[in-house]
Regions:
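Beta-turn initiation residues at beta-strand->coil junctions
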Residues: 2-8, 16, 22-28, 44-50, ...
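Aromatic-rich beta-strand edge motifs centered on tyrosine
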Residues: 9-19, 32-41, 56-65, 79-92, ...
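A motif-centric feature for acidic-aromatic and gly/ser/thr-rich catalytic loops and repeats
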Residues: 10, 97-163
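Acidic/polar residues at beta-strand termini and the immediately following turn/coil
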Residues: 25, 37, 71-73, 85, ...
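Short, solvent-exposed loop/turn segments that connect beta-strands within catalytic domains
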Residues: 26-29, 50-55, 73-77, 87-91, ...
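Extracellular/periplasmic catalytic domains that process cell-envelope and extracellular macromolecules
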Residues: 52-53, 60, 86-90, 99-100, ...
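Pocket-edge structural micro-motifs
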Residues: 63, 70-71, 86, 99, ...
């Protein structure tokens, strides 16, 4: 299957459960592989560019909420941890992110879109605006994954991962 995103045209291969297991750029230089566990959660993403693995992440979950990402290229070091609102019935509102040695807090709108990310001093590290269908424009230098509808944004694909599908 071919899809077009703002980062290019991708060939997508699906497994028997209809989950995207690989994305290959039109020129073949970039390959993104995804693995899923028995509950259908994406447990890993590996990005290969020009034959070299550029990133390889493993994800840890509490239920269906991603709570941590591990760098498989760097001794399984923790890349980031996420804290979700425990008062939400489905706990889908992100509250905080620890990335590296830095703490960030999320500002969300009523649709659970991340609108701002604040650093520990209260300065806006990133701000986002969205179209009705999730196309994002952002400001700030912070690169972090939780954006539209409180879901994971894959920067390489410019798609949002909704636990079962990419949109």
């Amino acid at each position: 299957t071919l899809i077009k995103t703002s980062t290019g045209v991708w060939t997508v291969v699906y497994n028997a459960a209809n989950r995207a297991v690989s994305f290959t750029s039109r020129n073949g230089n970039t390959i993104i592989e995804c693995g899923y566990d028995y509950q259908g959660r994406r447990y890993m993403k590996k990005v290969t560019q020009n034959g070299t693995v550029a990133s390889h992440e493993r994800y840890l979950y509490r239920g269906y909420l991603q709570i941590a990402s591990l760098d498989m290229l760097d001794n399984r070091n923790v890349l980031r941890t996420l804290l979700w609102d425990p008062l939400e019935p489905m706990a889908t509102r992100p509250l905080a992110l620890v990335q590296g040695a830095s703490l960030y807090c999320y500002g969300v709108d009523f649709n659970k879109n991340v609108s701002e990310v604040f650093d520990a001093q209260g300065t806006i590290a990133a701000a986002y605006d969205y179209s009705p269908y999730g196309a994002v424009t952002g400001t700030g230098s912070l690169v972090q994954p939780v954006q539209w509808s409180g879901e994971m944004h894959d920067e390489e694909l410019a798609l949002v991962y909704y636990n079962y599908r990419y949109y």
